[in-house]
Amino acid sequence: VKNQALKERLAEASLRQYFISKAPIIIVACGFPDNCYSRMGNYMKSWAVDVACAVEHLMLQAEEEGLGTCWIGAFEEMEVKALLNIPENVKVLALTPLGYPDEEPRYRPRKELEEIVSYDKY
């Protein structure tokens, strides 16, 4: 989405996360639940996994190119769909603004590997 008025309305539909409207574009990541592999152990839909992987790869490559992104998962899906005329059979999984950052993010210390990884059992 490049249109400024639409970006501002998407920011409003994203629980008033207005910073996203400042990016040159907002990517709206969608999937087709009816056209996906339906057997993933009945605990997860493959369309969501597929779209999430695609968005994450996009975000990693954007970082490599010096671009900034931010996964936006908090939004009113029906409002987003109405704004963009997204068909009923299509689900919106995430939004991400994309552009060159205005500032460097502040450093946040990372957890030690032992704090987040388990071996052999939880």
Task: Please name every model-derived segment.
Residues 1-54:
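Glycine/small-residue-rich phosphate/adenosyl-binding loop
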Residues 15-17, 87-90:
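Short, hinge-like loop/turn segments at secondary-structure boundaries
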Residues 21, 89-92, 110:
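A short, structural micro-pattern
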Residues 23-25, 68, 93:
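Short, surface-exposed beta-edge/turn micro-motifs
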Residues 27, 35, 42-83:
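Small-aliphatic-rich amphipathic alpha-helix that forms the alpha element of a beta-alpha
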Residues 30, 73, 98-99:
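Conserved residues at the C-terminal ends of beta-strands
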Residues 82-88, 105-108:
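Short proline/glycine-enriched turn/loop segments at secondary-structure junctions
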Residues 94-122:
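C-terminal helix-cap and adjacent tail motif
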